[in-house]
Amino acid sequence: MSNSPESSTPKQSIPARFPKWLRQKLPLGKVFSRTDGTIKNKGLPTVCEEASCPNRTHCWSRHTATYLALGDACTRRCGFCDIDFTKKPLPPDPQEGEKIAASAKALGLKHIVITMVSRDDLEDGGADALARIITTLHIELPEATIEVLASDFEGNIDALHHLLDARIAIYNHNVETVERLSPLVRHKATYRRSLMMLEQAAQYLPDLMIKSGIMVGLGEQESEIKQTLKDLADHGVKIVTIGQYLRPSRRHIPVKSYVSPETFDYYRSVGEALGLFIYAGPFVRSSFNADAVFEAMSQRERLSASIQ
């Protein structure tokens, strides 16, 4: 019998109301305003705004942001995502690396997180453009660590290796949901291909921190979350984020359930038993508190190395 907090409670197909644990105060202030001004002054899209992230005020009030590279429109139309869809995006901006570097300098970032729209219109999926951005950041901010949340490059392993050759601290690629729901949630992406890309990254650079993330509340079962965590661990992933799916608008996939904080704690214990570093909670997203997660994982690896 399952020991999860939700094992004895009935499932609701449609949540009746917004639970209290998903209500939060907005920490606006001078730091938020400065971050907002710095980003807009450089004309840079962020996933914070384009994807309607609920943590934007929190992160910007901490002088952190996640840059959205290769444009603000995506060649895929995933059912959970609020980023605009287009079949013909603009060419990559050759000055994007310099713009991100200038913004990161102004914000004093020591850990820079970059995500990207899927660019299926480009032969390499945008890997070279992203690698060039990373190279520029290394030149302009040599002390900063860089985390990249990349697309699946349509399974192009050469493109993945080219990106990884640019030297990053964390490679992140999200499976987003359990295998059964993946065809409903993700457009032109597959669960198994995502696992393959994660495994390829782990094999190519064994010391690289490999990260992935999943959303809950989409209709998944507890057993499926457990299997997903096992799959991720078996494919070389070291860090997993787990957060509540929140519907950006009525045209997106509806929320099937609101997962309790106790259940997030339970999933954390399941993942930790598999050797994973789990960051889980209702508002957790792939890049939420990414700097703190990176530091905690770094400390864990240093401790592990000292014991051996």
Swiss-Prot record:
It catalyses: [[Fe-S] cluster scaffold protein carrying a second [4Fe-4S](2+) cluster] + N(6)-octanoyl-L-lysyl-[protein] + 2 oxidized [2Fe-2S]-[ferredoxin] + 2 S-adenosyl-L-methionine + 4 H(+) = [[Fe-S] cluster scaffold protein] + N(6)-[(R)-dihydrolipoyl]-L-lysyl-[protein] + 4 Fe(3+) + 2 hydrogen sulfide + 2 5'-deoxyadenosine + 2 L-methionine + 2 reduced [2Fe-2S]-[ferredoxin]. The keyword Iron-sulfur applies. Pfam families: LIAS_N (PF16881), Radical_SAM (PF04055). It is an enzyme of class 2 (transferase). Its EC number is 2.8.1.8. Pathway: Protein modification; protein lipoylation via endogenous pathway; protein N(6)-(lipoyl)lysine from octanoyl-[acyl-carrier-protein]: step 2/2. It is found in: Cytoplasm. Gene3D superfamilies: Aldolase class I. Its cofactor is [4Fe-4S] cluster. InterPro entries: Aldolase_TIM (IPR013785), Elp3/MiaA/NifB-like_rSAM (IPR006638), LIAS_N (IPR031691), Lipoyl_synth (IPR003698), rSAM (IPR007197). Binds 2 [4Fe-4S] clusters per subunit. One cluster is coordinated with 3 cysteines and an exchangeable S-adenosyl-L-methionine. One of its GO terms (molecular function) is lipoate synthase activity. Residues 60-277 form the Radical SAM core domain. Keywords: 4Fe-4S, Cytoplasm, Iron, Iron-sulfur, Metal-binding, S-adenosyl-L-methionine, Transferase. [4Fe-4S] cluster 1 binds at C48, C53, C59, S287. Its main location: cytoplasm. [4Fe-4S] cluster 2 binds at C74, C78, C81. One of its GO terms (cellular component) is cytoplasm. NCBIfam families: lipA, PRK05481.1, PRK12928.1. Belongs to the radical SAM superfamily. Lipoyl synthase family. This is Lipoyl synthase. It comes from Chlamydia muridarum (strain MoPn / Nigg). The gene is lipA.
